[in-house]
Amino acid sequence: MRNCPAVHCLAANGKSWLACADSLPDVSRLYRALSPNWNHQRLSAPEVLTGDYATSGFAFHNHIVSYAGKRICLLHDARWRHKISSHPLTIDYLYISKGYKGRIEELTTLFRIRTVILDTSLPDYRSDILREDCSRLAISCISLKERGALCIPL
């Protein structure tokens, strides 16, 4: 949903979580926009997460979702700027939205990035810069402006 980047994780038992990049998402707008889809799929409303959370098989810490053996990092700010690690963390999907002003290269000292997802909230010029970074670094890149919603079966 535009200007509300989030990752929706569904468990086989019908439980689900909506991990939000923004600490103050417009929850009522989210529910209005997405409840028809949830109802169609006979899903209960997800648990909306804006901060750290963990339960059996699912964790959301420092805007990194760990679920079903995958890691998805929601990036919308400078939280990782000027940070380094001797053992970069593998990130399956780096979901970048409005607010991130850096480059992909800056993140490679922290993360081993497999795929970058560019949110629709990014201005075109930022998307172009990040897409070029991905191309130069041989990292797969998906633009939600071009593709729309992304579903990843696990």
Language-model features, listed with the residues they occupy:
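Extracytosolic and intramembrane catalytic regions of membrane-associated proteins
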Residues: R2-L154
